[in-house]
Amino acid sequence: MEQNNSLFSRIINANLVLQIIFGIAAGIILATVSHDLAKSAATLGGLFVGALKAVAPILVFVLVASSIANQKKGSNTNMRPIISLYLIGTLLAALTAVTMSFAFPTTLVLVTGAEGAAPPQGIIEVLRTLVFKIVDNPINALRTANYIGILAWAIGLGIALHHASQNTKDVLSDMSHGVSFIVRFIIRLAPIGIFGLVANTIAETGFSALGGYASLLGVLLGSMAIVALVINPLMVFIKIRKNPYPLVFTCLRESGVTAFFTRSSAANIPVNMTLCEKLNIHEDSYSVSIPLGATINMAGAAITITVLTLAAVNTMGIQVDMFTALLLSVVAAISACGASGVAGGSLLLIPLACGLFGISNDVAMQVVGVGFIIGVIQDSAETGLNSSTDVLFTAACHRARERS
């Protein structure tokens, strides 16, 4: 009995990452033993993701407004190099996906298209939607978790209150600390939430439906692994001039794992902000760069759009020259940056990319259908890469500034 208590206390008092690993293992075991119980555990996962999604909009709004209002004269938020890394990283991810698709060409067994889905008609529509999100009603932006709109209003309010009395600034600062406290409490519940998510996912799918798409998943996941373990570390090394892997693995472990199971960049914003605080990054920087990254830093989405589009091209027997492939990389990168402005995200931007090759919308929507089938893995890996990269690039720019 004492041994059991000792084991339980070790689990309770363990590092959060170890607790998450234990939650993953427990979820797999439960799904293997009882599918019904595992499906019931979905409530725990839903509550955890719901809590993160609920707190994220108000966290971003209060933190950004407080940070700008309390900003000291002459301080530098370091946003330009961070945004540059976001955009360059997304483009390099698309180029990596093109290279992998040429090296390991895949074809698809097309299925019924995604019913009721409404893809954008062109790149202009994607960008137009993104721009109009800036002028959204602030209450509606908070209600719908429109982070572009939330950022715009928070920045505007922060600038307006920058010259307010110190008491007003202190109220904003105290509110940001209060919301941060709630976030830390929710994050401590991550092992329980991830236990529920893992148990339900395995019980619902068993991953058996993915067997027919092994080669496609191989190219997708291989591209994402190359970006996470080769391209991103190289970019960070160029920035900080020292071994990037300790920072890379910290971001993957503490941000990527949670994002993988929540499958939501928005839900992972509080996790990323807590990690930035742990890495001693200036709040002025990460309070803006993390929610902005959740909107425009979309390396995983660029890979998904590129790989599935080229798989459709191969299936239709269309020959692709290098110039067109490079053009696809640029279109995929720009589209990926606007993925947050499209319901359904990266998958519903595939018809836009397919239009480059004259592929009909009917066929393109069947490709989207394939995307939904493999989504349990593709969407998880995509979100893990996107979200962990937000912290990685923010931390890299912070360390580069400290070094200079």
Swiss-Prot record:
Q: Keywords assigned by UniProt?
A: Amino-acid transport, Cell inner membrane, Cell membrane, Membrane, Symport, Transmembrane, Transmembrane helix, Transport
The reaction(s) annotated as catalysed by this protein in its Swiss-Prot or TrEMBL entry are:
L-serine(in) + Na(+)(in) = L-serine(out) + Na(+)(out); L-threonine(in) + Na(+)(in) = L-threonine(out) + Na(+)(out)
Its record classes its membrane topology as: Multi-pass membrane protein
Which compartment or compartments is the protein found in?
A: Cell inner membrane
Question: Which GO molecular function annotations are given, in alphabetical order?
Answer: neutral L-amino acid:sodium symporter activity
Q: Biological process GO annotation list?
A: serine transport; threonine transport
Q: What does this protein do?
A: Involved in the import of serine and threonine into the cell, with the concomitant import of sodium (symport system).
Q: What is the official name of this protein in its record?
A: Serine/threonine transporter SstT
Could you tell me which species this protein originates from?
Answer: Desulfotalea psychrophila (strain LSv54 / DSM 12343)
At the highest ranks, the source species' classification is:
Bacteria, Pseudomonadati, Thermodesulfobacteriota, Desulfobulbia, Desulfobulbales
- Gene name, please? sstT
